Amino acid sequence: MKKVHLGVIIAGAAVGLAALILTALGNPTNMGFCIACFLRDISGAVGLHSAAKVQYVRPEIIGLVLGAFIMSVASKEFKARAGSSPAIRFVLGAFVVIGALAFLGCPLRMVLRLGGGDLNALVGLIGFTGGILLGIASLKKGFSLKRSYEAHKAEGGVLPTVMAALLILVVTVPALFKFSEEGPGSMRAPFWIALVIALVVGALAQKSRLCMVGGLRDAFMLKDFHLLYSFVAIFVVTLVGNLAMGKFHLGFALQPIAHSAHLWNLLGMVLVGWGSVLLGGCPLRQLILAAQGNGDSAVTVFGMLVGAALAHNFGLAGNPDSKSEAGELIVGGISTAGKIAVVLGLVVMLVVVILNLPKKEEAKA
């Protein structure tokens, strides 16, 4: 087995194991890691939205960024670059998270949900794959957000600095932040344990180029499957772990923090897949790229934070399945505003692609 394959398998297995440990220690079920959900919690903690059930400074996000930053500096892979259509990336990042919160999970949580038996995530995977195929079609037509340029090191260090400052503030002045007393935001692993686990995962993700989108994109586009091994490793480890702990529950209805409104699970993840290909990586990959000096990815992460806040300020996020007092299933889903936002996001993706295709003169050249 090639060394690169072994590296991505180890990284994927570590992510799966870390997710199981974090869930066992208090994180929500099938949500050991979720980039979209955890960014949403942070946006609530700093006051960008007022949804009381989803507010917490998630140490997992801080750890992922700082772990990747430390690894990139240690391996001399930290390179400050920026200038590749930052405003467009901000908007795309916002819509990617809106799509993820319609589904109730980023691509990483989608895999974790599959490993827990949640078949709604299979619907999400179909949509995610469809979105990636749309992204590949866009790339083959010549779509590009143009090149980035070498930048000052201070530019590349923006997100690691923000995360380090956030860590210092939450430890020394926790009263500055809002913390959920019920709901998903109140379900959390011990802070320092979660931080240390995330530091390790961030370092491994940086070194292995771990990306939930990259595996499927490269498999379809280049017949290169090595990144896909990490995707499979995460699934296998979480599946085996959940089976061993009696946490595997196969089905659609009443899955943890999930809904069975299939159309919107599918379309939400189409939006995530398409947007992630256009951006050059999934939400996890954007965190890692920003940590190793990519200013454009940092802008994307800030867009994701704003998108998460918008999703809860305007009621765009999905609502989980529930039971009535009579014990009948109440299928969750998204509001009319959420449906409009997902469709609008798909339209925005299309417009961005069209406006960033090569002009006839460029194509001839």
Feature-to-residue mapping (PLM):
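Membrane-interfacial helix-loop segments of redox and metal-homeostasis proteins
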Residues: M1-A365
